[in-house]
Design a protein with these regions (language model features):
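Conserved ABC ATPase "signature" region
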Residues: 86, 141-160, 213, 269
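A short, proline-enriched helix->beta-strand linker immediately N-terminal to the Walker B motif
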Residues: 184-188
Length: 353
């Protein structure tokens, strides 16, 4: 990613999202799904933070709260306004005027390029809609802006695409349209929710390269949501690993991948496929299934599956995420403040790519 001034663009503090479980029309809910629980992180200008974890861990819910598609139960999200350079408290935005202003700085690229577009609208209408909603430019100016963006995202020549419909495009072309729609307002922060997961492998790398190039050209900051560590390594400056609503490890990409500390991160890395079919990577074994996210006890969320759990893990609250050497943070009772493992013998990871 491009080196900018190191200014914090996104600051998340104690973010929490609880979904009540309905008990009927006249009974108050006492049980809650802790989808996101006390999540905090910062993203600097020009950086890309990868939010990694298995399905259901709270990645997408976190992203939706950052762009105010979902309201938080608790916590704060501050995002720097592109126009005034001031930090906006996202959860306090209420009026339509403030929401429209907020959308100029923040956008989202959705996972499914087949479901996130209105099939009855042309490509021009889809990409130009944010400009129309904001009342920006004349029809001719909007058309020129759309043409320029289609060219920028690699749909050339752009003119034949303007009056096509989504069903006339391939999956890769639709995702390029989704990227163009997200960038038409020139946002400074974009949440990308697994934008390549539904595309053919042959197309994924071109979309990822495109997003990196646009970050360099336009200075866009990304929160990149993915379950694929290989994608996160290619796309992101930093990675945060999420498990059952909690961030369990976070750090610079190479530091985290070369020296994973949390048992869950190590298990994820050991499961990454190796290109050499004759080589079998040593597996980090974890037992059981993911624990229930309904009213979870105040313990380590990974306790039920961790092969190294000790009495401290069972008796103490979930460990805080704090630095264990450099900018590398991990939430584990068995990692010392210097980043040393004290939890017993582990399988040595062979991280050959």
């Amino acid at each position: 990613m491009s080196e900018q001034n190191g200014q914090v663009r996104v600051k998340v503090d104690g973010l929490r999202k609880l979904f009540p479980i309905s008990k009927g029309l006249f009974r108050k809910s006492t049980d809650f799904v802790y989808a996101v629980d006390d999540v905090s992180f910062e993203i600097k200008a020009g950086e890309s933070l990868g939010l990694v974890g298995e399905s259901g861990c709270g990645k997408t819910t976190t992203g939706r709260m950052l762009v105010k598609l979902d309201d938080a139960t608790d916590g704060e999200v501050h995002i720097r306004n592109a126009g005034t350079d001031e930090m906006i408290e996202v959860m306090s935005i209420q009026s339509k005027v403030d929401q429209k202003e907020f959308r100029k700085s923040v956008q989202m690229i959705f996972q499914d390029p087949y479901e996130s577009m209105n099939p009855r609208r042309t490509i021009f209408d889809i990409v130009a809609e944010p400009l129309s909603v904001q009342g920006i430019g004349t029809t001719e100016e909007r058309e020129q802006r759309v043409v320029d963006l289609l060219r920028l995202v690699g749909l050339t020549p752009p003119e034949p695409f303007l009056f096509r419909y989504p069903h006339e495009l391939s999956g890769g072309q639709r995702q390029r349209i989704a990227i163009a729609r997200a960038l038409v307002m020139e946002p400074t922060f974009v949440v990308a929710d697994e934008p390549t997961s539904m595309l053919d492998v042959s197309i994924r790398i071109s979309i990822m390269r495109l997003m990196l190039e646009l970050a360099e050209k336009l200075g866009v900051t990304y929160l990149y949501i993915t379950h694929d560590l290989a994608v996160a390594r290619y796309m992101c400056d930093k990675i945060a690993v999420m498990y059952l609503g909690k961030i369990v490890e976070m750090g610079p990409t190479e530091s985290l991948l070369e020296n994973p500390m949390h048992p869950y991160t190590r298990a994820l890395l050991s499961a990454v496929p190796v290109p050499d079919p004759s080589y079998r990577r040593p597996q980090v074994e974890i037992e059981g299934g993911v624990a229930r996210a309904i009213n979870p006890p105040d313990q380590c969320r990974f306790l039920q599956r961790c092969p190294f759990a000790v009495d401290q893990c069972r008796n103490d609250p979930h460990p805080d995420l704090y630095e264990r050497g450099g900018d590398h943070q991990v939430a584990c009772h068995l990692v010392t403040s210097e980043g040393n493992w004290v939890g017993g013998e582990r399988v040595e990871l062979d991280l050959r790519s």
